[in-house]
Amino acid sequence: MRFQGSSNYVSTDDLTLAVNAAITLQRPLLVKGEPGTGKTMLAVEVAKSLGVPLLEWHIKSTTKAQQGLYEYDAVSRLRDSQLGDERVHDIHNYIVKGMLWQAFSAERPVVLLIDEIDKADIEFPNDLLRELDRMEFYVYETRELVKARHRPIVFITSNNEKELPDAFLRRCFFHYIRFPDKETMEKIVGVHFPALKKSLLREAMEVFFEVREVPGLKKKPSTSELLDWLKLLLAEDIPAEALRSKDRKTIIPPLHGALLKNEQDVHLFERLVFMTRAKGA
């Protein structure tokens, strides 16, 4: 089973190599990179390309590792016991299978996405070490050992909000998705907007990378935000020439709210771009 790329996702050679290396080693692929660089979509497209189901576990700050295995609803069982419900005699009625259990019990290999693992507390990755390494876990309430019928292809994404434990890192294959250069970005845009006029693409790309290169910017726009912006430009039929105005009143690009998400960044960009374009006039 090998990933050969996807017509809906621009995968660089090194990224494709990393995916296949993780599959060969049967280790989770830990993917880091700026927000909006396609870390989550990578798992989606790999699943589509390989023709296997996708299971997604989106991590929050309150998520516990146990939830990925299973949860035992003791409160509901106690309530049913008090009401004389017949369901109470079978403990399986009160066990909710987590994403790892679903992946382990699947009748065919699946892609399992553990998304934004760094949002959880620092012990979260360590609490999954044994389960991801041995592909099994024990259910104490039913005294059964759950083993993976087929080893899932595991993708783990991180935005680098927290450092991950060394013991966890040793069990992963790592890849950092670098922010796309202009050539790669044009390919990405081409996948989403194949009929986009070259003039609009050229001007939009110039503005986008100009925004990203502004020193002191609090939040640089991401790939996904560029795609949102282009979608709006097309919907509003904004011409290419409107993106490069030298007029102080219109120097900020139309619909800039898709790119700049902070008022200080808007003012900073406006000031620097006006000075740059005024010099070039």
Residue ranges and their predicted role:
Residues 1-281:
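C-terminal regulatory/interaction module of P-loop NTP-utilizing enzymes
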